[in-house]
UniProtKB/Swiss-Prot annotation:
Keywords: ATP-binding, Cytoplasm, Glyoxylate bypass, Hydrolase, Kinase, Nucleotide-binding, Protein phosphatase, Serine/threonine-protein kinase, Transferase, Tricarboxylic acid cycle
Domain of life: Bacteria
Protein's cellular compartments: Cytoplasm
Organism: Methylibium petroleiphilum (strain ATCC BAA-1232 / LMG 22953 / PM1)
Entry similarity comment: Belongs to the AceK family.
Protein's UniProt keywords contain Cytoplasm: yes
Its biological purpose: Bifunctional enzyme which can phosphorylate or dephosphorylate isocitrate dehydrogenase (IDH) on a specific serine residue. This is a regulatory mechanism which enables bacteria to bypass the Krebs cycle via the glyoxylate shunt in response to the source of carbon. When bacteria are grown on glucose, IDH is fully active and unphosphorylated, but when grown on acetate or ethanol, the activity of IDH declines drastically concomitant with its phosphorylation.
Main localization category: cytoplasm
Protein name: Isocitrate dehydrogenase kinase/phosphatase
Length: 618
């Protein structure tokens, strides 16, 4: 039936099913948007635990609504028994319902999510689901009188005058109507104004000089971000202004970020999703893409918390790449994992990870436990140090594109997840992550200067994870990767734990000569016990690496460091981890602003570690 097309919409059930599907999506997006909009009140109230909880729970909304919709279709329409012709009509009616919809691309993805739970894999083609988008997202506008525009444009009253620009910047901040006082907004605007001068220098202002700012704030963890761009002539420069609470519980603008590189760091795939109140998400993506043209649309949808849309868009990009490439999938280079089989396509900058059916004795785990660890990372604050992953089910690959060694590897380690259907290999479950250079390989090939800064970055990554209440579990170099821009990121999650669930202990003193000389562990070890003093022999065999590590991160071998961070988090403290180099922060007079926070932030992130290893963010 491929390629056939219904010419008559004659099944009344098809319209009712389409309407039920759209009702399910509209309910989902209403709840999604409500949670995102409430982020402003949580930020104003400094409700950091509430903000983190909302970020976690919002991720779960989508699957709940999909399950509800699938159950309704089965109960009311016996959806799984309907004919192919009826399902084609359902899609056509659904397209008609989306003509004036403000989130048509999200609604199409929701349609796919529900119908693929009901229909057999043979239906997974464009006749029945949205393999390709059907409704344009260009130039969608909300025509309602009281609606907010996607962005506001500001024209400084006296171009070339510092006073005119200053008043404009004050008005930009004031228009967000934050219900908490700034410590000194005038002072902060002066800092921003100076940052603008430093960025743009003595440029001639064109007739079209303007500042465009997205109408909603971007909330994540303890920060709110004003995101916009400066247009002057043919030049457009993106910027972001982070607004934080200081130690006096007043607001301050912490810094000004400019240009694609700094915004890429803010919107990194290794960070938690933003909470943003959006009526027309495609318009936000289009605006953000103008600030970061190197960032694909699917990553921007992810960053906005619309990870299912990002996942759908990514898969379309992958199929397009597959069609226009000819290289073969292979076993990924590097040390093979004990719980994951990893493969890649050399021409495609991602890796595919499949959970094995069995594990060596030292890995006391299960498939369900491993999947729960990946879900933990998905819903947790990744603080720029844990790679986001895309989870897929029932993915069909062309058999002829697989190297024979890879097929045999999958047959051996993952037989329960493999279906061989003619020319296709179907994997029932897998994760896809961005490809990085394993840190152990990077260190082997690095120059002395690169090695030094990679080791510093490695320690910074662990400290950032600790600040987010994460203990990596297995801290070996091979479980960390270096991105193409030099950032060190953790990507092996099967042993990850909450820091507050671990018991950090000092190695006991031996009581006898036999215990002192024993090559075995003679003291008792509980299931969540961790002995930081024992990290050294596994990590620091290279004398040069050891010297750098001990100079910058010796405290990681001290149980007191870990226990101190654990106690503070258990006491309710939410650490600050900044998505920009701390040396970029505005420096305020002594006694004002963040107080001791400045010292802690700088000690966690030596500026040279990131600027020397790679000046670009992830």
């Amino acid at each position: 039936m491929a390629g056939s097309f219904v010419t008559t919409l004659n099944d009344p059930r098809a319209f009712d099913i389409a309407q039920a599907l759209l009702d399910g999506f509209n309910r989902h997006y209403k709840l999604f948007r409500q949670t995102s909009a409430e982020a402003k009140q949580r930020f104003e109230a400094a409700d950091w635990h509430g903000q983190q909880r909302a970020q976690r729970e919002r991720i779960e909304f989508y699957d709940l609504r999909v399950d509800e919709a699938a159950e309704r279709l089965e109960n009311e329409f016996r959806a799984s028994s309907l004919s192919e012709e009826t399902w084609q009509q359902v899609k056509l009616y659904y397209i008609g319902l989306l003509i004036n919809h403000h989130q048509p691309e999200l609604a199409e993805t929701f349609f796919n999510s529900v119908t693929t739970k009901i229909l057999h894999r043979s239906y997974f083609r464009n006749d029945f689901i949205f393999v390709r988008p059907a409704v344009s997202t260009e130039y969608i506008e909300n025509e309602e009188p009281d609606s907010l525009p996607t962005y506001r444009a500001y024209y400084p009253s006296r171009p070339g005058s510092a006073e005119g620009l200053r008043e404009t910047l004050l008005r930009i901040v004031d228009n967000y109507q934050l219900q908490r006082e700034f410590e000194d907004l005038g002072r902060d605007i002066d800092y921003v104004l100076q940052a603008f001068r430093n960025q743009f220098g003595d440029v001639k202002l064109s007739a079209n000089f303007q500042i465009q700012v997205l109408a909603s704030l971007f909330f994540r963890n303890k920060g709110a971000y004003i995101v916009g761009k400066v247009i002057n002539g043919f030049r457009e420069t993106g910027f972001a202004l982070p607004v934080l609470h200081n130690s006096r519980e007043l607001l301050t603008i912490d810094t000004a970020l400019f240009g694609e590189d700094e915004l890429l760091l803010l919107f990194s795939f290794a960070r938690a999703y933003f909470l943003v109140d959006m009526e027309i998400p495609s318009a936000y993506v289009q605006f953000l893409r103008s600030l970061m043209p190197r960032k694909p649309r699917w990553e921007l949808y992810n960053a906005l918390g619309l990870q299912k849309q990002g996942k759908n868009q990514f898969y379309r990009d992958f199929l397009y790449h597959l069609r226009h490439s000819s290289d073969s999938f292979r076993i990924a280079p590097g040390i093979k994992g004990m719980v994951m089989l990893v493969f890649d396509l050399p021409s495609f900058p991602f890796v595919f990870k499949v959970i094995k059916d069995f594990y060596p004795p030292q890995k006391d785990t299960t498939r369900e436990l491993i999947q729960s660890k990946y879900q933990l990372v998905k819903t947790h604050d990744r603080v720029g140090r844990m790679a986001d992953s895309l989870e897929y089910s029932n993915v069909a690959f062309p058999r002829q594109r697989f190297e024979p060694e890879l097929i045999e590897e999958i047959r051996h380690f993952c037989p329960s997840l493999l279906e061989e259907e003619g020319d296709s290999l179907v994997l029932k479950h897998l994760y896809i992550e961005r490809r990085m250079i394993p840190l152990n390989i990077y260190l082997q090939e690095a120059t002395p200067e690169q090695m030094k800064h990679a080791v510093i970055e490695y320690g910074n990554a662990i400290k950032d994870l600790v600040a987010a209440n994460i203990f990596p579990g297995d801290m070996l170099w091979k479980n960390f990767g270096v991105t193409r821009h030099g950032k060190v990121v953790f990507y092996d999650y099967d042993e990850i734990e909450y820091l507050t669930d671990c018991n950090f202990r000092k190695v006991p003193e031996p009581r006898t000569e036999e215990e002192e000389m024993s090559g075995d562990i003679w003291y008792s070890v509980g299931p969540k016990d961790v002995f930081p003093e024992t990290f050294g022999p596994f990590l620091l065999g290279n004398p040069t690496v050891r010297e750098v590590f001990m100079q910058h991160h010796a405290e990681l071998l001290d149980p007191a460091f870990w226990q101190g961070r654990k106690d503070r988090i258990a006491g309710g403290y939410v650490h600050d981890v900044f998505p920009y180099d701390p040396h970029k922060r505005f420096r305020r007079p002594l006694g004002l602003g963040f107080g001791s926070l400045d010292a802690e932030a700088v000690s966690l992130h030596p500026a040279s570690a990131t600027t020397q290893l790679g000046h670009n963010p992830i």
